C-alpha cells in the first residue's frame, strides 16, 4: 500500500468525521434531536455493543487460527477491517431485532434506502479499485476487497432490516385479524 493511499484513507476518515460533526451541530442549533432513544432502546444498544465485541473477538480468534494453519489470506489491514465489519454487523443485527437501531419516530424506509445506496457506492468504488490494484496480489486479497466487504455488510444489514419490518407487519396484520 503506497503512502498516498494511506494518506487518502486518513483524509477521507477525517473528512467524514468533520462532516458528521457539522451535520449534528447544525441540527442541534436548529433544535432538532435526531437521536432520540428511550431507555429500552439504550439497554438494547448495550446488548448490541456486547454482541459486537464478542463477534469481533471470535472473528479475530478464528482468523488467527486460519492464518496460523494456512498462512495469511490478506494483508493485516484487510483482516482488521473485516473484524470491524463483523462487529458492526453483529451490533446492527441485535439493535434491529430489538427495535433500537433507529431513533424514535423514524420510519425504517429511509434507512433501508440509505444503506442500499451506500452499498451501491461501495460496489462502484470497489470495481474502480480493482482496475488499478486487482483483487489478488501474491496470493492474498488486496485492499480492493474492503469496499466489497463493506457493500456485503450494508446489504446484510439491509436484509435484516427488511426482514424485521416484514415480520413486524405480518404480526401486526395477524393481531388485527384476531380482534
Question: What does each model-found stretch correspond to?
Answer:
Residues 29-44, 175-178:
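Cytosolic, membrane-interface loops and tails of multi-pass inner-membrane proteins
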Residues 42, 100-120, 173-178:
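Membrane-helix boundary/juxtamembrane motif in polytopic membrane proteins
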Amino acid at each position: 500500500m503506497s503512502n498516498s493511499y494511506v494518506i487518502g484513507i486518513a483524509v477521507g476518515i477525517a473528512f467524514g468525521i468533520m462532516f458528521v460533526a457539522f451535520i449534528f451541530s447544525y441540527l442541534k442549533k436548529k433544535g432538532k434531536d435526531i437521536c432520540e432513544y428511550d431507555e429500552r432502546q439504550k439497554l438494547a444498544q448495550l446488548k448490541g455493543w456486547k454482541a459486537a465485541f464478542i463477534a469481533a473477538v471470535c472473528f479475530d480468534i478464528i482468523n488467527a487460527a486460519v492464518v496460523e494453519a494456512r498462512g495469511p489470506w490478506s494483508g493485516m489491514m484487510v483482516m482488521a477491517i473485516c473484524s470491524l465489519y463483523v462487529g458492526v454487523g453483529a451490533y446492527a443485527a441485535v439493535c434491529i431485532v430489538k427495535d433500537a437501531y433507529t431513533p424514535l419516530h423514524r420510519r425504517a424506509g429511509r434507512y433501508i434506502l440509505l444503506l442500499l445506496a451506500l452499498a451501491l457506492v461501495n460496489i462502484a468504488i470497489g470495481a474502480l479499485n480493482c482496475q488499478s490494484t486487482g483483487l489478488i496480489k501474491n496470493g492474498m486479497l488486496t485492499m480492493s476487497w474492503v469496499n466489497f466487504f463493506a457493500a456485503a455488510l450494508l446489504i446484510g444489514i439491509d436484509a435484516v432490516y427488511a426482514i424485521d419490518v416484514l415480520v413486524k407487519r405480518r404480526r401486526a396484520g395477524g393481531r388485527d385479524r384476531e380482534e
